[in-house]
A protein has these predicted regions:
Chain A
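Short hydrophobic "helix-edge" motifs at membrane interfaces and signal-peptide entry regions
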Residues: 44-46, 142-145, 157-158
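A cytosolic-side transmembrane-helix exit/cap motif
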Residues: 60-68, 139-143, 177-180
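Short alpha-helical linear motifs
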Residues: 70-71, 108-109, 144-148, 182-185
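Transmembrane alpha-helical segments of integral membrane proteins
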Residues: 136-150
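Interfacial loop-to-transmembrane junctions
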Residues: 147-168
Length: 185, 181
């Protein structure tokens, strides 16, 4: 008798993946609509960075909260020192990494032959989008972790796929809105 | 827990991920013209990226648990348990990629774009399956390697794999687009 069955893995995974695809299509649709607007800029290059790194930040917080809920060091309520410290660490990490990436985009834009103002606008767009995304990451991961734990589901299986899909949509939308409307790339 | 050490560890792994994601970014920038030529391609790129991370993230986390509980031993042998895990991941890749193809066509039609269902399906399935195959094998290697090294899969394996997955997926989408024309 084997522990893993193909049938069971598929039946448990496909519904969640399907929900993720539905959420992800909104991110894709937004990108498709903005293609002409971002032509000639480096915004499309920023998409995997904001989505990927944002997703990674969510994964790390989700995995940490999942373990803490199982261990009992965090209770599914919005208070307590361990929860506050975890959120604090995530916000600091996100500010640090998004600042680092915006500096990289400043350098890439300069090397691409764009002027100082255009390069600075690229950096500004990335950091603004990152700062808009950070609360979405924290709120969605904490909410999903608590809800799934209260419902008796394993946060490890539910939180990360759904949170990364939500983060993808939020990242693509905030990046495109910031880049086109606010910074005017 | 110590906030400082969590931030430092997180930043270290994320800086490495940043450079890999930049590769994916350059690839997308290089595909910009193709996005204009193939309506609907941009729609499915993001769900395909997301899918890769989700399937391999789940595979990595199941393998991590299986290694810790001794169900799978840290050797590269195709046992029944490992085969079931790998096959399930590959079948899921295939079925979900096809789902993405159909739904992107539907979404594109609703947005009033001149989308071609056959073209989108072929690109989605080829890109999803090739990247799924490469990533599944890589996930097994990385899971066994990190387990033998004693690294924490929560903090290192998952972010690293999802980032490598992004780069592989964008590469495979580009290959599929070149193949379809």
């Amino acid at each position: 008798m084997s522990v893993y069955s193909i049938r069971r893995i598929m039946l448990e995974s496909y519904p969640i993946l399907f929900i993720c695809v539905l959420i992800g299509l909104f991110a894709g649709g937004t990108l498709e609509k903005s293609l002409t607007g971002i032509k000639g800029t480096l915004v499309i290059m920023m998409v995997p960075l904001l989505n990927g790194i944002g997703g990674n930040l969510g994964c790390i917080l989700g995995a940490r909260l999942g373990s803490a809920l199982h261990l009992g060091t965090v209770e599914p309520r919005l208070k307590g020192r361990v929860l506050r410290k975890n959120v604090h660490a995530s916000v600091l990490t996100s500010i640090g990494i998004f600042l680092f990436i915006s500096v990289i985009f400043f350098v890439i834009a300069c090397m691409w032959g764009m002027g100082f103002v255009m390069a600075a606008k690229h950096a500004l767009a990335f950091i603004l989008a990152g700062m808009l995304l950070t609360p979405v990451i924290v709120v969605s991961v904490v909410t999903l972790a608590f809800l799934s734990f209260q419902k008796g589901l394993d946060p490890d299986n539910v939180v990360i796929p759904i949170a990364t899909s939500i983060i993808d949509v939020a990242a693509a939308i905030s990046l495109l809105i910031v880049a086109i409307t606010i910074v005017g790339l | 827990m110590d906030v400082r050490s969590v931030v430092i560890q997180g930043l270290a792994i994320l800086i490495i991920c940043t450079f890999i994601e930049l590769g994916a970014g350059f690839m997308l920038k290089g595909m910009e013209e193709r996005f204009m030529l193939i309506p609907g391609l941009a729609i499915m790129t993001l769900p395909l990226l997301d899918l890769r991370g989700n399937i391999n993230g789940a595979l990595a986390s199941r393998l991590g648990t299986a290694l810790h509980t001794g169900v799978i031993s840290p050797r590269l042998k195709l046992t029944a348990e490992l085969t079931a895990n790998l096959s399930a991941s590959l079948i899921l890749s295939l079925i979900t990629s096809a789902t993405i193809g159909v739904l992107s066509w539907l979404m594109g039609s609703m947005m009033g774009l001149p989308v071609n269902i056959l073209q989108l399906m072929v690109i989605a399935v080829i890109a999803g399956f090739i990247s799924g195959l490469v990533l599944a094998l890589l996930t097994v290697l990385v899971a066994v390697f990190t387990y033998l090294r004693g690294w924490d899969p929560d903090n290192i394996t998952s972010p690293a794999m999802s980032t490598i997955g992004d780069l592989m997926t964008v590469t495979c989408i580009y290959l599929a687009v070149l193949l379809v024309g």
